[in-house]
C-alpha cells in the first residue's frame, strides 16, 4: 500500500503540472478517503466469516493494477527546453522543502491520529455519547475529506500559498471546539469541518512539494512525506502518553486540547511563512513593436 501511494503521487507530479496536477492530487486524496470508508465497512462485514476472510480485500488490488497497465502510458513525459539533454542524468536530490514539509506532516499526523483515537473516550467521559456514536460520527470526517479532495483544485486557485495554513488553522479551531463540546450535534459539526480542512491541507502539501521539486526527485519527495505520515501515526500514542504523564493529566479533554494547540502552532508558523513569501508573478505579455 505504501508503494502504491508513493508511486501514484509521483506519477501525478511527473506527468502533470499546475492546475491539472492540483486537481489530480485532490482526486487521489478523495479516492483514498472514499476507499478507506468503503473498505472499513467491507472488512467489518467479512469479519462475520472469520478473520482470515478480512484479508480478501487485498485481492481488490488487482483492479488498480489492471487499470494502470491499460491506461497509464509507459513513455517518459516529453521535456522541453534545455533540460531535455540532462533529465536522463539527473539524480534525486533532497531539498529544504521536502525536509520542512516532512516535519510538518509528521506533527500533523501525530495530532490527527491522536484526535481520532480520543473521540470515543471524550464522548464517554463527557457523558453525552457512546463509543458506537463516536464511531458513526467519526465517519463524517471521511465523507467531508472526500468532498475536500474533489473541490481541492478549485479552492487551491483561490487560496494559493495560504491554503495549507488556512486549512490547518480551521482544523485546529475545530479540535479545540470538539474539546469543549457538550453535545453530539456540535461535535459532529466540528468533526465534519475538521475532515474538510484536513482534506484541503494534506493535498496542498503534496502539491507544494511537487512544485518545488525537479522531475528526478519527485518520487523521493512523495516518499519522504508518506514516511513522515506513517511515522506520525505510529508514534502518536507514545507522544500523547508522554505528554499526559508529564502533566499528570490522562483525560481525553486534556489530550484533545493539547492536540488543538499543536495544530494551532503549525497553522501560525505556516501562515507567517506564507505571508513572508513573495507571490509568483505572471509573465508580462510581449507587445509587438
Question: Model-predicted segments: where are they?
Answer:
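Helix-to-loop junctions at the C-terminal end of transmembrane segments
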Residues: 148-160, 244
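C-terminal transmembrane helical hairpin of 12-TM major facilitator-type secondary transporters
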Residues: 160-205
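Cytoplasmic helix-loop-helix junction between adjacent transmembrane helices
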Residues: 1-31
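Extracytoplasmic gate region of multi-pass secondary transporters
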Residues: 97-139, 145
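A late C-terminal transmembrane helix in Major Facilitator Superfamily
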Residues: 212-249
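Intracellular juxtamembrane helix-capping segments at the cytosolic ends
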Residues: 4-16, 200-214
